[in-house]
């Protein structure tokens, strides 16, 4: 009799284990895929977006509609491109509305207005205004404007933005390299402009701001720069550049230049707004380097992926990592 009880308990335990295995297996499979993809941003984002779509199949369409409501045609187009890649049907008429919004945003009058704004103010949030910003920086107008403005504040003991000052100082030297290399350093130049613009409009992530601030302070001799910019002027660009060069520590600029290059890579594949989105969520230069890999793989879909997943589009976050390990370990314990 006891033997029958033991057999019954064994069978019941086996059945329970089998049921638990069946319930856990899909989650364990996803967890395993996440762990294996943690060093590949493109594959990682695919896995997580597919999971999000299983939970809410309308997420992409909702994202596109919200982007249109926010007057962000570029983001809306990113969502429709992602929908096409994933084979997701969009609500009737949504794709046509997105195309019309993109056409309007790219109109000649709108582009010219935003280019002029970027050139004069040095602030950008799209391709046209960034083109104006980069043009201003390539003609050294933009960087000298920033060096003079922030440098004067520093010289007068006011609260100067030393990050913008440091980026502008690096930019003056990179601009010279761009001319020498017949444009070869333009992606780095554009990247520096975007980091600077993101800082000005409060779209640079806290972690990246802290890192870039430390790096920027290291590339200039503050007392020498303070003395140099005390007499600097946009009207005397040659004198200003020479003064900044004297205070510049080229050997310390490598990290900022690498960051700018990665930002430029994101911009080339995902657009200016895509690069600015990345700068907002990045916790440091490694995040931006991973974003460059994501953008090179996903192109125009990058903004939608970042919007849906946040920083999770770039790396396996601590919460997701711990959950994946827990599910995987639970399966092995059966």
Could you say what each language-model-derived stretch is?
Residues 1-14:
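N-terminal Sec-pathway targeting helices
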Residues 25-28, 41-44, 114-115:
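Short acidic/polar alpha-helix capping motifs at helix-coil junctions
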Residues 34-107:
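Alpha-helical protein-protein interaction scaffolds
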Residues 57, 69, 73, 137, ...:
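Solvent-exposed, acidic/flexible segments
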Residues 109-158, 169-170, 176-334:
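Compositionally biased, low-complexity segments of secreted and virulence-associated proteins
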């Amino acid at each position: 009799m006891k033997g029958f009880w033991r057999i019954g308990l064994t069978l019941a335990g086996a059945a329970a284990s089998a049921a638990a295995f069946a319930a856990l297996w899909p989650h364990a499979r996803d967890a395993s895929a996440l762990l294996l993809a943690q060093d590949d941003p493109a594959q990682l984002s695919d896995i997580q977006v597919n999971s999000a779509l299983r939970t809410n199949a309308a997420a992409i369409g909702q994202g596109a509609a919200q982007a249109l409501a926010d007057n962000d045609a570029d983001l809306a187009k990113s969502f429709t491109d992602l929908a096409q890649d994933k084979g997701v049907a969009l609500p009737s008429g949504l794709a046509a509305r997105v195309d019309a919004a993109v056409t309007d945003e790219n109109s000649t009058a709108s582009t010219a207005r935003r280019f002029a704004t970027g050139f004069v103010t040095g602030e950008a949030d799209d391709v046209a205004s960034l083109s104006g910003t980069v043009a201003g920086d390539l003609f050294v107008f933009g960087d000298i404007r920033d060096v003079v403005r922030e440098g004067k504040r520093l010289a007068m003991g006011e609260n100067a933005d030393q990050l913008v000052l440091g980026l502008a100082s690096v930019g003056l030297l990179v601009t010279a390299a761009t001319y020498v290399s017949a444009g070869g350093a333009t992606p780095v130049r554009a990247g520096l402009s975007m980091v600077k613009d993101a800082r000005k409009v409060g779209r640079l992530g806290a972690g990246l701001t802290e890192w870039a601030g430390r790096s920027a302070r290291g590339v200039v001799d503050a007392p020498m720069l303070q003395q140099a910019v005390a007499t600097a002027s946009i009207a005397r660009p040659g004198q200003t550049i020479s003064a900044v060069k004297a205070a510049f520590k080229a050997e310390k600029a490598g990290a900022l230049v690498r960051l700018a290059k990665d930002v430029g890579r994101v911009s080339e594949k995902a657009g200016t707004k895509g690069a600015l989105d990345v700068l907002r969520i990045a916790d440091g230069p490694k995040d931006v380097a991973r974003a460059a890999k994501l953008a090179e793989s996903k192109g125009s879909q990058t903004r939608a992926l970042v919007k849906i997943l946040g920083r999770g589009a770039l790396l396996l976050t601590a919460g997701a990592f711990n959950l994946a390990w827990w599910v995987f370990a639970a399966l092995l314990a059966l």
